[in-house]
UniProtKB/Swiss-Prot annotation:
GO terms for biological process: cleavage in ITS2 between 5.8S rRNA and LSU-rRNA of tricistronic rRNA transcript (SSU-rRNA, 5.8S rRNA, LSU-rRNA); rRNA processing. PANTHER family: CLEAVAGE/POLYADENYLATION FACTOR IA SUBUNIT CLP1P, POLYNUCLEOTIDE 5'-HYDROXYL-KINASE NOL9. ATP binds at residues 333-340. Its EC number is 2.7.1.-. Polynucleotide 5'-kinase involved in rRNA processing. It comes from Aspergillus niger (strain ATCC MYA-4892 / CBS 513.88 / FGSC A1513). This is Polynucleotide 5'-hydroxyl-kinase grc3.
């Protein structure tokens, strides 16, 4: 099987579609060569990671400043006033008709226009890492789109959120922890924060689910980083539903002491509605949630928007759910089009715990969720594709449920580590993993025959990603395909419609989610999800998750022997280009690795078969036929003859078991005989004792169970984002402790006078905390910049800006350049 080193050679396009793209790019380059110069340069998308200047190593490069006024952004403003043209339907071989397409909604009705969050009113010191600002990751350069700060500051609007207004008659009871209210039919409430919801009377809708009266209590997470869930009364007794909201103390809010990304994302000061329901309680009383009538009620003045569903989305969800257990749908579309939101709504709708839904479908077998998006997975940390079996609706963003281990909501049936946030790094391995997960779903159907399937495909929908998507449509035996963009482009919609027609399944085209501004970039949300994953736990006997605010450096690690008679790690694999064994220690130390259970000694993919999705020099460049991938059996790489043990090289100095097979780049593990248990942070490599110190949320019982089954464990170092959030945790924790001590002294001064605040013990504690901050600021790979120069103030201002998603189409295509 050829790996990436062999794929890197120049080759002809793989299909007519790729050939057209190459000709379009050549024509675009020719046109650019004769175009007269313009005063305003066209700026390229940002690099994958910000780099420091050689002259000023501690100040992060700010490519955003050079990119905020582009011709594309100005052209987009002009085109926003125009009515969107519908994408032409695919014409070849009469593909099926897509659902009726309507113009996009105006971006002023965006569902996720959020503002940044900073906990402190004062500006904190800027923390800079070797790749940029720690905790505020640099923007990512994706093939299908990129994120950049907004061209101009977005003004805070008095945006309506709740239709209902609380009064004495609508409040059933309330205290400092809970409140029970009546909501009239077709009226809604919006809250920010996190809370437990109990439907006592009537029926309410929430994030696609219809919740009926029962003893079930649902945990809801509603941060400002995402659009806020809307609680709407669908029907009720005497036209009203009765719902109780209760504060919950999961500890997730404590993560603000470890990362600025978690600061000011929950509720602020009590709103007018809160004060009404807190009458008779101390003035300092505050719940973990707040009722918002409009965005102006927010004390932090953030750009809050309700999570309303498009009418076309509602119709599509109702139509898809009518298929019941026969539903097997692939949801795809460009980056930022709302695939994850639509998938979450459809999932919750299918899991609505009603005795009988409007579609006469009674769900007792749960829902299978096949997540093929390694960059923004829903129920797992980044870099993984997995099959989950859900039994209960889930209300919250991905960082509120980064793992299903021990969860009552569902389980992970099987997971595979891709080792990157995009499948384009190794599409062959990606497709093999998807095929194995689909086989696991078919096996799951033996026990749950009425279990529908939702497949979430990543935003990698152009070029080779389109080849993979169309192959999946033809091969997986689906019932439906949903494409999340009415704007095309034609180069995507036409092949996708053709594949759906050949598979005899309908293609539904829906409007994308009208999101223009968000308060966290994709890279920042990945950091938040990773940090949440490593700090989350589920103690026995507790239904909901808990988060620990202790930095990972103070967490007791697993100590695993990598050599000797008690060896627990069979090998260490580094995905991508081969490295010299002498460098393995440096590559491994302080990195994120996948803990993979290997079920066979012959678990490495061989090299005897060519790649499934690589450019082929002998491929046809004309005609309308793409690469023939319909016979998947011929395309599956065979297992090599070498075993894992025979492929291990011991490093000369540390005796680390370096596992490498391949020509130039590492062959991955075969998904059919391996699966991922989770991620771990390598805290240190103890050469003297031949041990690795691993910090991981994987339980000891899980690891013991794998070893008792006779499986071995391999650590896989992929191409994931560096754990900068973990490096800076001690510094932010020290700052938070010093702030709490400072507030205590100020309170003592106010209550007991200056003399009480000048106690020797308090002064000693103050010095200890300052020393802790000093020591925490001197860790490797991190620099604290304390000056208040103009460039630092500008960097802090960029940190507060909103992020705008820009999507790119092919040059010379029928679609808009920035759409």
């Amino acid at each position: 099987m050829k790996r990436k080193a062999e794929k890197a050679q120049a080759a002809a396009p793989v299909s007519a579609f790729a050939a057209r793209k190459a000709r379009q790019q050549q024509a675009q380059a020719t046109a650019a060569a004769v175009k007269p110069p313009v005063a305003e340069p066209v700026v390229e998308p940002p690099p994958k990671r910000a780099r420091r200047s050689l002259e000023e190593p501690v100040v992060p490069v700010a490519p955003e400043e050079n990119r905020v006024q582009t011709r594309r952004s100005s052209r987009r403003k002009e085109e926003q006033a125009k009515v969107e043209k519908p994408t032409p339907k695919a014409r070849n071989d009469q593909p099926p008709k897509a659902s009726k397409k309507l113009p996009e909604h105006d971006t002023s009705k965006a569902t996720e226009d959020q503002a940044p969050s900073d906990e402190e009113s004062e500006e904190p010191d800027v923390v800079v890492g070797n790749t940029g600002v720690i905790g505020l990751e640099p923007i990512q350069n994706e093939e299908e789109g990129y994120e950049s700060p907004a061209d101009t500051a977005v003004q805070v609007q008095d945006f309506p959120l709740s239709k209902a207004r609380l009064n004495k008659n609508s409040i059933v009871y309330s205290d400092e922890h809970r409140m029970c209210v009546r909501i009239k039919e077709k009226m809604s409430l919006v809250m920010i924060g996190h809370y437990d919801l109990w439907v006592k009377r009537g029926v309410v809708s929430l994030m696609g689910a219809k919740l009926h009266p029962s003893s079930q209590v649902y945990r809801v997470y509603a941060p400002s980083t995402h659009s806020l869930p809307v609680i709407k009364c669908v029907s009720g007794v005497n036209g009203e539903a009765e719902v109780e909201f209760k504060s919950c103390h999961s500890g997730i809010y404590r993560l603000k002491e470890l990362s600025p990304l978690y600061q000011r994302i929950w509720n602020g000061k009590n709103t007018t509605a809160d004060k009404l329901t807190l009458k008779g309680t101390p003035q300092s009383t505050k719940r973990t949630f707040s009722v918002l009538y409009t965005s102006a009620d927010d004390s932090f003045k953030r750009h809050l928007r309700p999570l309303h569903l498009e009418k076309q989305w509602s119709s599509a969800i109702k139509s898809l759910s009518q298929r019941g257990g026969r539903l097997k749908t692939l949801i795809c579309g460009p980056k930022g089009s709302g695939k994850s939101t639509f998938s979450r709504y459809l999932l919750n709708h299918l899991l609505s715990p009603a005795p009988q839904t409007e579609t006469k479908y009674f769900n007792t077998d749960g829902v299978a969720f096949l997540d093929l998006d390694p960059g923004q997975p829903e129920f797992a940390p980044m870099g993984q594709v997995y099959l989950a079996h859900l039994r209960s609706p889930v209300f919250g963003p991905p960082f509120s449920h980064p793992s299903l281990d021990g969860s009552r909501n569902g389980t992970i049936v099987r997971s595979h580590h891709i080792g990157a946030t995009s499948p384009k790094e190794d599409p062959d391995h990606y497709v093999l993993a998807a095929m194995d997960l689909m086989d696991r779903y078919r096996a799951l159907q033996a026990s749950y025959p009425q279990c529908p399937l939702i497949i979430n495909y990543p935003g990698w929908i152009f070029g080779l990603g389109l080849e993979v998507a169309t192959w999946l449509v033809r091969s997986l035996g689906l019932s439906d395909v949903v494409y999340m963009s009415e704007k095309g482009p034609t180069e995507v919609v036409q092949p996708l419609g053709q594949a759906a027609y050949q598979a005899k399944i309908p293609l539904t085209i829906l409007p994308s989610q009208p999101t223009d501004f968000v308060s966290r970039s994709s890279a920042q949300l990945r950091s938040m999800q990773m940090q949440s994953y490593f700090h989350m736990s589920r103690p026995n006997g507790i239904n909901n998750s808990l988060w620990l605010e202790q930095p990972l450096s103070r967490t007791k690690p697993f100590r695993v022997h990598y050599s000797g008679p008690q060896q627990g790690i069979q090998g260490i694999m580094v995905m991508g280009t081969e490295i010299h064994p002498d460098l393995l220690h440096e590559v491994l130390d302080g990195s994120i690795v996948a803990v993979v259970a290997v079920e066979s000694p012959n678990a490495i993919l061989g090299q005897n078969s060519g790649p499934m999705f690589a450019n082929n020099a002998n491929a046809e460049t004309d005609g309308d036929h793409d690469v023939d991938m319909q016979d998947s059996a011929d395309a599956v790489p065979v297992i090599g003859t070498s075993t894992i043990e025979s492929s291990i090289t011991r490093t000369p100095n540390e005796d680390l078991p370096y596992l490498f097979v391949g020509a130039g780049s590492s062959n991955p593990l075969d998904p059919k005989v391996s699966h991922c248990l989770g991620l771990a942070l390598v805290r240190s490599v103890n050469v003297a004792s031949r041990q690795l110190e691993l910090v991981t949320p994987i339980t000891g019982s899980t690891l013991r169970g794998v070893l008792e089954q006779g499986h071995s464990i391999v650590l896989v170092r992929g191409l994931l984002d560096n754990p900068n959030w973990a490096i800076s945790e001690d510094y932010y924790a020290a700052r938070a402790a010093e702030k709490r001590h400072r507030e205590l002294i100020e309170k003592l001064k106010k209550d007991k006078g200056a003399a009480a605040a000048e106690d020797a013990t308090l002064e000693s504690e103050k010095q200890v905390l300052k020393d802790r901050i000093r020591r925490a600021s001197k860790v490797p790979w991190m620099t604290v910049v304390e000056d208040n120069s103009r460039r630092q103030r500008e960097a802090a201002q960029r940190e507060k800006s909103l992020w705008k998603l820009r999507k790119k189409a092919y040059p010379g295509s029928d679609s808009e350049g920035d759409w």
